[in-house]
């Protein structure tokens, strides 16, 4: 029996001679290495189809090139090598290559006061592009934090002042009386509203970076906000968290400005687009602020 040659339909000519911006695969499961952690990820891999006469690309070649990602720590240099392999395997067909990786980074976070600690999840996406031999790499990071409304805090303080006047008027008080009152239900007759909030960061990195500064960026963002959500806590930690919220009252505008200044201080950041979302507990809608910035060339 004669062996038949397997057909390669993708190598045939297209009936419509049209180039395509992006062709590839989405949702490819793979492991990656970031800062010593082996993480489960999904990848979207593709190339441009610039030869409009070609029927299609060779998706299996892109798939096989992704094997590089589970063998080495993820760095800008590795991402560029993968993209170059995409193009080398599609010589004459494609000029541009694209790779998006989605994962959840787990960081062990200590409690504010007690010796407890717990794991915290940070959704991260890494997008790399090689367009006309120009390399670009971007990070998308989501960071959750708590925000307490400054206006609501002022209104709550006023109600507490009024309750104090109602309870004591012009009565002469001892220190112990005031201390007892402050520790009673009347001493906190009103509380400001607060909510879990989210910072969504899109950061363009310097492609010459040796690594991906994901941990450093997260640490800087949480330090700038001062109210990162916690993991394992005791009562002392919860009290410290209440203090942190009271010392970091924030409208969404305040949070956006804090993050703007923090990200500008990182030499690894070439540009960013940040969005903060405060899921208002007072309202049925969200309060949102955005900020963009691009570093001027030296």
UniProtKB/Swiss-Prot annotation:
UniProt catalytic activity: GTP + H2O = 7,8-dihydroneopterin 3'-triphosphate + formate + H(+)
Pathway: Cofactor biosynthesis; 7,8-dihydroneopterin triphosphate biosynthesis; 7,8-dihydroneopterin triphosphate from GTP: step 1/1
Alphabetical GO biological process terms: tetrahydrofolate biosynthetic process
Keyword Zinc recorded: no
Site description May be catalytically important, residues in chain: 149
Its EC number(s): 3.5.4.16
Domain of life assignment: Bacteria
Gene Ontology molecular function terms on file: GTP cyclohydrolase I activity
A Pfam family: GCHY-1
KW Hydrolase (keyword) present: yes
Keywords: Hydrolase
Segment forming the signal sequence: none
Broad enzyme group: hydrolase
HAMAP family xrefs: GTP_cyclohydrol_B
PANTHER family (alphabetical): GTP CYCLOHYDROLASE MPTA
The family this protein is said to belong to: Belongs to the GTP cyclohydrolase IV family.
Function: Converts GTP to 7,8-dihydroneopterin triphosphate.
Name of the protein in its database record: GTP cyclohydrolase FolE2
Source organism per UniProt: Pseudomonas fluorescens (strain SBW25)
Encoding gene per record: folE2
């Amino acid at each position: 029996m004669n062996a038949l040659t397997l057909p390669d339909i993708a190598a045939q000519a297209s009936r419509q001679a049209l180039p395509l911006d992006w062709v590839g695969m989405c949702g490819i499961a793979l492991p990656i290495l970031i800062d010593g952690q082996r993480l489960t990820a999904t990848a979207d891999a593709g190339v441009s189809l610039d030869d409009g006469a070609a029927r299609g690309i060779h998706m299996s070649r892109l798939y096989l090139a992704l094997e590089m990602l589970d063998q080495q720590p993820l760095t800008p240099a590795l991402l560029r090598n993968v993209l170059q392999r995409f193009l080398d395997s599609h010589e004459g067909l494609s000029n541009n290559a694209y790779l998006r990786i989605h994962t959840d980074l787990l960081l062990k976070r200590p409690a504010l006061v007690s010796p407890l600690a717990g794991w915290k999840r940070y959704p991260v996406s890494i997008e790399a592009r090689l367009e006309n031999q120009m390399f670009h790499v971007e990070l998308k990071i989501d960071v959750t934090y708590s925000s307490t409304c400054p206006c609501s805090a002022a209104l709550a303080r006023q109600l507490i002042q009024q309750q104090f006047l109602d309870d004591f008027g012009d009565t002469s008080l001892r220190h112990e009386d005031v201390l007892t009152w402050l520790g009673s239900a009347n001493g906190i007759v009103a509380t400001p509203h607060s909510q879990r909030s989210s910072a969504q960061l899109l950061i363009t990195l310097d492609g010459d970076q040796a690594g991906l500064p994901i941990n450093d960026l997260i640490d800087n963002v949480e330090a700038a906000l001062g109210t990162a959500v916690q993991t394992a806590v005791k009562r002392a930690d919860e009290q410290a968290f209440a203090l942190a919220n009271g010392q970091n009252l924030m409208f969404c505008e305040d949070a956006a400005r804090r993050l703007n200044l923090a990200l500008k201080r990182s030499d690894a950041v070439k540009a960013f687009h940040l969005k903060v979302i405060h899921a208002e507990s007072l309202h049925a809608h969200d309060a949102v602020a955005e900020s963009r910035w691009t570093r001027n060339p030296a």
